[in-house]
Amino acid sequence: MAIKSYKPYTPSRRYMTGLSSEDITAKPSVRSLLVKIPASGGRNNNGRITSRHKEAGAKKLYRIIDFKRKKFGIEGRVEAIEYDPNRNCRIALISYKDGEKRYIIRPNGLNVGDVIASIDEGALDIKPGNAMKLKFIPVGTIVHNIELKPGKGAQIARSAGGYAQLMGKEEKYVIVRMPSGEMRQILAECMASIGVVGNEDWANITIGKAGRNRYRGIRPQTRGSAMNPVDHPHGGGEGKKNSGRHPVTPWGKPTKGAKTRRKKASDKLIISRRKGK
């Protein structure tokens, strides 16, 4: 997907870049697949901030995405490629032979008019958009939209340019190399889709101005070293003095590379940790 630049009629637009919309079908979204989700602004039910640096952003409707791919044995045709304001990849509108329509994450190479399917037992052609259980996918295949628990829906490799690779099979598990580089065992009964998530150039765009992040619901982030000691462990000092300690969160928890993940039962499924991250 091509990256486009803008005429610099303001200083903020001089270095701003965006993604071309040539691949988007000129067609309205399906109303039955749109729902309103009230913006939390990072607040909980008591109105207190539980996630900092968030706001409502631009008004948008949520697109209901089929992450489970349970339409077994029924072929579907790609009717449209659409923009989704809730995620950084494109979505594809699939029209099935029984008349139902669903949105899925669009992988690279999936275009209007293509036919895809999903199956619970047996294998399908290894082509972008087809979905099947991991135990039926050949070793070495690139996949996305991977389940961690059978029937729960895809949780892994869903963002723009994301993918994982099937590295091996052993009894009821398969070995998958995650997008982070981590090697992990996943139950062979879990579903996955073939291909790489599209819109891989998303990582290369330049935001260009603060307002563009505000549209996305991202508020400014104040450095801890610019605060007073009462507000942050890095605060205080004369001038731009360093904090004199390893980087921590406002609540004193180690950050910037320090491992904070608690031990879990699923740790035994991780074969090797990610490297170079």
Swiss-Prot record:
SMART domains: Ribosomal_L2 (SM01383), Ribosomal_L2_C (SM01382). Residues 231-241 have a biased composition (Basic and acidic residues). Gene3D superfamilies: 2.30.30.30, Nucleic acid-binding proteins, Ribosomal protein L2, domain 3. GO terms for biological process: cytoplasmic translation. It holds the Pfam family Ribosomal_L2. Residues 219-277 are annotated as: Disordered. Keywords: Ribonucleoprotein, Ribosomal protein, RNA-binding, rRNA-binding. It comes from the Bacteria. Signal peptide: none annotated. GO terms for molecular function: rRNA binding; structural constituent of ribosome; transferase activity. One of its GO terms (cellular component) is large ribosomal subunit. One of the primary rRNA binding proteins. Required for association of the 30S and 50S subunits to form the 70S ribosome, for tRNA binding and peptide bond formation. It has been suggested to have peptidyltransferase activity; this is somewhat controversial. Makes several contacts with the 16S rRNA in the 70S ribosome. Part of the 50S ribosomal subunit. Forms a bridge to the 30S subunit in the 70S ribosome. Belongs to the universal ribosomal protein uL2 family. This is Large ribosomal subunit protein uL2. The lineage of its organism: Bacteria, Pseudomonadati, Campylobacterota, Epsilonproteobacteria, Campylobacterales.
